[in-house]
Amino acid sequence: MAEYDLTTKIAHFLDRHLVFPLLEFLSVKEIYNEKELLHGKLDLLSDTNMVDFAMDVYKNLYADKEIPLALREKRTTVVAQLKQLQAETEPIVKMFEDPETTRQMQSTRDGRMLFDHLAEKHGFRQEYLDTLYRYAKFQYECGNYSGAAEYLYFFRVLVPSTDRNALSSLWGKLASEILMQNWDAAMEDLTRLKETIDNNTVSSPLQSLQHRTWLVHWSLFVFFNHPKGRDNIIDLFLYQPQYLNAIQTMCPHILRYLTTAVITNKDVRKRRQVLKDLVKVIQQESYTYKDPITEFVECLYVHFDFDGAQKKLRECESVLVNDFFLVACLEDFIENARLFIFETFCRIHQCISISMLADKLNMTPEEAERWIVNLIRNARLDAKIDSKLGHVVMGNNAVSPYQQVIEKTKSLAFRSQMLAMNIEKKSNQNSRTEAPTWAAQDSGFY
């Protein structure tokens, strides 16, 4: 399913270290030629200090050739640089290991106070911060993400938000936590980075748009692994205008992930309301991006094309199973998508043949009946089954006029927001730019 693979588009907005897990996944799925993927890895590794990894990839690619001299020399250089930086950083690290310093770090959020404490007790100087940052960056480039995260934490606690490396250190810390799969810490870092970007009054509107676009892509790692991720992704991508604007302007392919998060959301009430807002966005962007997942929603909720929805659902399975971020959502997606087809079909028909439903849901009649029985049993459906006639008779789920007014009022704010964003989007079309080089080609640090 290379046709629907988004790795190339997404990698453009990621740090090169974050691309490696995606390439490993593609290698397992055998979507692309293995040699092409190995060439891609080698190219990504060329500007990192992960020389041993690069050597392993080179051996896999050219089994009958010797390791190039340039790689061997680079390894010697990297080891020498690492030893030098370790020697420079060792006295600084010892300061942080002091029990009193640890207590100070835990009890105060004021970086200036902590800096003054370290200066008074240990002779800490401003240039030590630059040394700490350089060492953290070097550790990251070597693939030692735990070391990078530790030193970047010390750095973040001490530097003011105006420091020239403050923002880049937040990107580096987030990348390190993602690569170590520390999802709670990554969620905290993601929130902190978002606040920094949103409160930045120095960046131009175009720079802020670029930062939000990168954040949207990096956040996929966190949102599809953290327990609260599928709620948070909806709140950020759909209901925060600046981020929805970034998606519509720079990366409409992200709608695949927003749509999946909505469909697989466990809160049934929230899911139904959010779906209405999502459908409007999908309709607006259908001319710039579509795939089986967004088309499934369009078939079902715009065209009421049940045969088309069923066909798209089968295609969705292939898309999900071959998507790095969505493969774990497959079962939830299929289950909830079938429920959506069923619910929509039931709104139109009061009495439904089980065999017809089975056909619409791509199930056997026996499977469909068991599935409906479970829905009724779990109080997710107001209906009765007539086993003799093979029919499902729907209960009366009429919505009160009061509730209808509430629902319509809720949608007014969203429609106003969409109108404002469309105006802004048109004004941004001429200033659309590519991501800066470090997003995909250099480290996550500036």
Curated annotation (Swiss-Prot):
One GO-annotated biological process of the protein: formation of cytoplasmic translation initiation complex
GO CC annotations on file: eukaryotic 43S preinitiation complex; eukaryotic 48S preinitiation complex; eukaryotic translation initiation factor 3 complex; eukaryotic translation initiation factor 3 complex, eIF3e; nucleus
Family matches, as SMART domains: eIF3_N (SM01186), PINT (SM00088)
The organism's place on the tree of life at top rank: Eukaryota
Signal peptide extent: none
Pfam families assigned to the protein according to its UniProt record, in alphabetical order: eIF3_N (PF09440), EIF3E_C (PF21357), PCI (PF01399)
Classification via PROSITE patterns: PCI
PCI domain: residues covered: 222-399
InterPro entries: eIF3e, eIF3e_N, PCI_dom, WH_DNA-bd_sf
Cytoplasm recorded as keyword: yes
GO-annotated molecular function: translation initiation factor activity
Ranges where the record places region Disordered: 425-446
Family: Belongs to the eIF-3 subunit E family.
Subunit annotation: Component of the eukaryotic translation initiation factor 3 (eIF-3) complex, which is composed of 13 subunits: eif3a, eif3b, eif3c, eif3d, eif3e, eif3f, eif3g, eif3h, eif3i, eif3j, eif3k, eif3l and eif3m.
Record-linked HAMAP family: eIF3e
Protein name: Eukaryotic translation initiation factor 3 subunit E-B
UniProt gene name: eif3e-b
